[in-house]
Amino acid sequence: NLGYNGCTQGAHIVRKIKRTENINVPWLFFLNIDSSYADLHSRYQAIFDQGKELGIYVYCLYTDGDPEKLLPLIEHNPDCAMILLCNSAAITEDFAKAAESLNNMLIGVAYDDNTDTACLVLRDHRLLYSIYRMYTDTESDEILSGSYARFAEEMHCPFVTVLADPGCSASVRENVYKAVVGARVAQKYRTIPIDLFYDIERIGNIISPPSSIIGFKPDGSIYNIGSDGNPLEHNIFNESLRDILKESFSINQES
């Protein structure tokens, strides 16, 4: 799904829409989902359907609630590659057992005091998982020193991911990304370091530049910040994804 649907077939659709409609479609986007909704399928399936029409087959999902409630959505979209980010405390035996039948999902476990226990549960159930951590200006030392990647090695993670807190300075972000790329090129660890935002942007620039990174909050409002520094006023539950991208992510708009 990631290689063919996301980066080949989907990329072809993304490029065609850019060429014919001047809309800059991202190859991936983020959904922060409130798992307390009674019927997540009726609330979110239309978003996946709209995304696939635009060539988007890769989704990064996050919930600070119960990730097991998101599994039916993932199961209902077997042609998509799903990255499910969740808190380590939410990784239970019940969740792992329910996830065993899904083969289009990578589970991202938050880096904290319970990460090792969560990884052990997922490994016992033979699930694909990695760890991720959000860092600030004062929390980058473990990443730069390599201790975070070495911990991921011990957890048998194929990937070790970092993402910058919104308040993180540009200089720290750049230093972390240089360290991530350097370790990856040198194959320094038995895990592949990934900077989630920078690497998504890099792949997006290969598929169809300029890359756009967008996401939607639980209430449907958009994460992306416009070029003028003001939040974009869009809501995925009130507008179609195509209309949002056409209005605020068209080539003429961005230039």
Question: What feature does the model see in each segment?
Answer:
Residues 39, 43-46, 65, 171-175:
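Alpha-helix N-cap and loop-to-helix initiation/capping positions
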Residues 15-18, 23-26, 44-48, 59-65:
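Long alpha-helical, hydrophobic tracts
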Residues 2-6, 36-40, 114, 233, ...:
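Non-membrane alpha-helical secondary structure
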Residues 1-31, 53:
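N-terminal [4Fe-4S]-dependent radical SAM core
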Residues 70-72:
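Domain-exit/linker segments immediately C-terminal to small folded modules
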Residues 2-6, 57, 79-81, 186:
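N-terminal start-of-chain detector that recognizes signal peptides
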Residues 28-40, 51-67, 77-117, 122, ...:
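Core AdoMet radical
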Residues 54, 80, 108, 116-255:
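Radical SAM enzyme [4Fe-4S]-AdoMet core and its adjacent flexible, acidic
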